[in-house]
Design a protein with these regions (language model features):
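Enzymes that bind and transform nitrogen-containing heteroaromatic metabolites
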Residues: 1-206
Length: 206
């Protein structure tokens, strides 16, 4: 069982835009940051529920497929679930739709816990107010021996890295520069301990 982080970052190391609104929950630059990932066959099948077989393949699709492999539980922040879009609506079910791509228990970190939400495809959102170590222990119990993914956003990833709780970083680097956004790494808080890394790339024709 490994604790994994799978995310897309820009060339200057940013993983999240900072201009999210209720009407544009991902932010203006999110499409640029995740363009290669969102164009893959795996993303279209798993997230958009598109059975056509369309979408890119090769290294980008391998990255996207690896995102979902072997996951038994997920941990994410309230923003990634979408709580800030409708914070006062107890019936708000997030912006992932009726069939979220996770299909496993998802622990949502929030200072305002609410009852769990069960979705039709096996996804269960569980809202907790807990430290990284404590929610990770709950996720381990729910994961059934499979891996646990720290899904984001950037501040949640940063907290788990600072606590030295991450075993694997699985990163797709987009060829863009975002400037001042949100970094997933601790920055001035101290170094991140690394274990092993491999690199694959896709060149641009010409």
């Amino acid at each position: 069982m490994a604790v994994r982080v799978d995310l897309n970052i820009s060339l200057d190391g940013f993983a999240t835009t900072t201009d999210q609104t209720a009407d544009d929950p991902m932010g203006e630059d999110w499409g640029r940051l995740t363009a290669a990932y969102a164009a893959t066959r795996t993303f279209r099948e798993r997230v958009l529920h598109d059975p056509s077989g369309e979408g890119t393949t090769e290294v980008d699709d391998e990255y996207a497929a690896a995102y979902f492999e072997g996951i038994g539980a997920e941990i994410m922040g309230a923003g990634m679930f979408g709580l800030h879009a409708n914070p006062d609506d107890p019936d708000w079910r997030g912006w992932w739709g009726d069939e979220p791509p996770f299909r496993v228990p998802v622990f949502v970190l929030t200072h305002s816990p609410r009852p769990p939400i069960d979705m039709a495809n096996g996804t269960r959102f569980i809202f907790v107010d807990a430290a990284p170590e404590d929610v990770l222990e709950r996720a381990r119990q729910a994961a059934g021996g499979r891996d646990i993914r720290i899904g984001g956003g950037a501040s949640v990833v940063r907290d788990f890295l600072k606590a030295d709780l991450v075993d694997q970083l699985h990163v797709g680097i987009a060829p863009i520069v975002l400037g001042r956004r949100a970094r997933p790494t601790p920055g001035e808080a101290g170094p991140v301990r690394t274990r092993r890394g491999t690199v694959r790339s896709r060149g641009r024709p010409g």
